[in-house]
Amino acid sequence: MELRLKERLGRKFDEEIRFFKGWMDGPKQVGAICPTSSITARRMASVINPKSGLPVLELGPGTGIITKAILQRGVAPKDLVSVEYSTGFYQHLVRSFPGVNFINGDAFDLDRTLGAFKDATFDSVISAIPLLSFPMDQRTALIEDLLDRIPAGRPVLQITYGPVSPVIARPDRYKIKHYDFVMRNIPPAQLWTYTRA
C-alpha cells in the first residue's frame, strides 16, 4: 500500500515538473500555473456522449490529465483526436496514451493540422487552449471553426480562468452557457460551452 502511494506521488510530481518545464518554455502556450485537476478534467469530459459513434476532438491536452478523463468517460483511444502545440508535451502524450490519435500542431489552423481527420465530424470538442493569450478575432474564429466540426446542439467546452467567457457573444451564430465553476483547481476554473444557435 505504501509503495503504491509513493508511486502515485512520484507520478504526480513528475507530471507537475513536466508541466512547469512546459510553462517555462512557452508561458503563452500554457494557460495556468498548475496542471488541471482530475476533478475539473472529469467535469470537462462529462459533456461527451461516448455512445454517439463519433470521435472526440481534444485541444491542448498538456500533460494528459484531461485525456485520461476523456478515456475514462468511455471514449476508445482510437476515437480520440488530440492536438497539442508543444512538442515536449506531445512526445510525453504519445508515450503515455497508446492508440490515441495525437497530433503535434496548431489548433488555430485545423484544416492543415488535422490531416486525415480534417473532414471528420466530432461528437464534441474539449479545449484547454489558453484562449485569453490570443486576440479576440482568433478566439471567435476558432470557436466558429470548431462548431462547424460538430453536430448542431453538441458542445465545444472551454476551460478558462477569467470570470467571463473568453469569447464574445454572437447570439445569431452561437450560444454561450456557463457550464461550471470548479473551486478544486489551481487557479479555480470556469467551464463554458458553445453550441450552434
Predicted regions and their residues:
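Conserved class I S-adenosyl-L-methionine
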Residues: 53-62
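Conserved SAM-binding loop of SAM-dependent methyltransferases across substrates and taxa
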Residues: 63-75
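Conserved SAM/SAH-binding beta-strand->alpha-helix loop
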Residues: 86
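Conserved beta-strand signature within the Rossmann-like core of class I S-adenosyl-L-methionine
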Residues: 153-160
